[in-house]
Amino acid sequence: MENLFDKMNHLKVLVIGDVMADAYIRGKVERISPEAPVPVLNSRHYEIRLGGAANVALNLKALGAKVYLCSLVGQDSKGEELIKLIDAEDIGSEGIVRSQSRPTTIKTRIIAAGQHLLRIDEEDDRPAFPDEKSSLLKKALALTALVDAVVFEDYDKGVIFPELIQEVTALALKRGIPVTVDPKKRNFTDYKGVTLFKPNLKELREGLKIELNPKNSAELEAACKRTVSDLGVQGVLLTLSENGMAIYADGTYHHTPAMQRDIADVSGAGDTVISVATACMAVGFDLKSTLILANMAGGLVCEYSGVVPIQKDILVKEALLVLGEQSQ
């Protein structure tokens, strides 16, 4: 198993999707505003981190991979700051297109005493313009020819579009490399033929237009099986929050319960799950081990406040303990 984790250090992965900045304003609340019944925050600290598809890139980098990003950011100061953060992490930014028509997506969280008071979103989620789509497609195809795996990280912010999905997937599968997807509603049915499709329960309900009981294994298995059939995907990894995760591929269904954790913040857990699942598939972990490791990693990052990447050494240590026990 340790050899497979070591192989991650030689991976090259392309992440295509919606990059954004996760900003945090932390401070102290000691009074209510005289102007309206709202708390007054005395701001003490401001921080910007990489978010969205860029957080997936951070997670893959933390696992040892060389990562490239393909995305769209605004021709603005926040875009400049975001690209500087990406470059500082030694993540390839040559696939990023600058847009004159939209701002860089930024999500600002207002926090006091460890509690979220408010989130402010600055974004434009319209589809990319034709010239932007052309640039994105050209860059994505060039990078797909160089890597060992491709991730589509879709936040419905306009970066990903059907032609991009189809052409990148076709090239990747022709090269024999895995294509994994963290989908959203807009492009849900366009990810045909990908290697692994990772919706959460809400996304699967909306995508299939059905009700699902997260505690009913028969319903979940049937929904995963239908997704494989309808989209022609090779496998489905379904995240179920406190009910764990399930994976369906090759006619086989596995479920693993959520591990007991001290949850501080669930932000970014889905990014970690798709990152770990992608790396596991690219180096040769079997389906059940991929499920267990992705579930484990998603839980580990929830123990920290804010959006943070996985710590590989902690994941490896826990994986050796848990998977080692299961193999005995």
Where are the regions that the model predicts?
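Positively charged, low-complexity intrinsically disordered leader regions
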Residues: 1-30
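Substrate-binding N-lobe of the ribokinase-like
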Residues: 2-4, 34, 38-106, 318
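A short, aliphatic-rich alpha-helical micro-motif
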Residues: 8, 144-145, 188-191
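Structural motif
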Residues: 14-16, 119, 148-151, 180, ...
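Conserved phosphate-binding/catalytic loop of the ribokinase/pfkB sugar-kinase fold
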Residues: 96-102, 109-144
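Short acidic, glycine-rich surface-loop motifs adjacent to enzyme active sites
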Residues: 146-159
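Conserved phosphate/ATP/ADP-binding segment of small-molecule kinases
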Residues: 158-253
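Conserved post-catalytic alpha-helical subdomain immediately downstream of the catalytic base
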Residues: 230-234, 259-322
